[in-house]
Amino acid sequence: MEEQITNNIPDGMGVTTEPAAESIAEPVAESIAVPAAESVAESLPEGQSAADGAGTHVGLSDDGLVLRAEGLVKRYGKRTVVNDVAFDVKQGEIVGLLGPNGAGKTTSFYMTSGLVVPNGGHIYLGKEEITKLPVYKRARLGIGYLPQEASVFRKMSVEDNILSVLEMTGKPRDYQLEKLESLIREFSLQKVRKNLGDRLSGGERRRCEIARCLAIEPKFIMLDEPFAGVDPIAVEEIQEVVWHLKYRNIGILITDHNVQETLAITDRAYLLFEGRILFQGTPEELAADPIVRKNYLTDKFVLRKNSFQDRPAPVEG
């Protein structure tokens, strides 16, 4: 796992100088295989959204639970790679963490996921501080994590991959089988449901991984480079899958080097530059900002949206 993390962090930010293993008490795979706990939101008072003021950590917006990072700091040796970074994700929205190589976006994402322990700052789910919780404990609170690397069980069929997680929910068998069929249909996996994990295309694998993650009914999903290793023809397919998750009232945090594909589906985005937040706003605001274009997007960048975003919201079931 440490090797995987090292491969995903930009040059000069390797975790070997300060291993992230201290934050991972259990395999990352458990983040998609542990039933979510009772809703944190049910026991929390009404709170403020991120826009209500910096420094607060009351974690409910008007629309639901908020996953919030405040003042994150990460140092490797004498080098500070993340310095006072703050962002939030509400249920039912898609938020992007963007930036050039070495900007600190991946490290910030890993601190929020539970893969890297910050040297400073706090992470909250609602009013509960989760800064030092490993991935599998965050999963029990309703935070799913999908790594860039393939996480399907390679020698299990698609339906068994999904069912293996459903079986851990403790729900009745009839419910498990009904939920399995619902997820198979929703993610158009009917034709490959009997295929082994190692026989899936990049797009099929991603759909299987997201379907399996939904088996635990998460409140938030962390997507690490969701468009990596996916054929160009399947990119819009994955975008549409992620886009529709917001209609389940799931908050999505994405980090990806494919800025065009990411901005096409995000509601808001944070741009990191040299370890700090340079800009935050809607994709349209980000694409129009001259400083952002100069330091990151270039003048030739054109923001594109997808046709599926104009369709009616899907009906679950």
Regions found by a protein language model. Give the residues of each.
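Helix-to-loop junction immediately C-terminal to a conserved catalytic motif
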Residues: 113
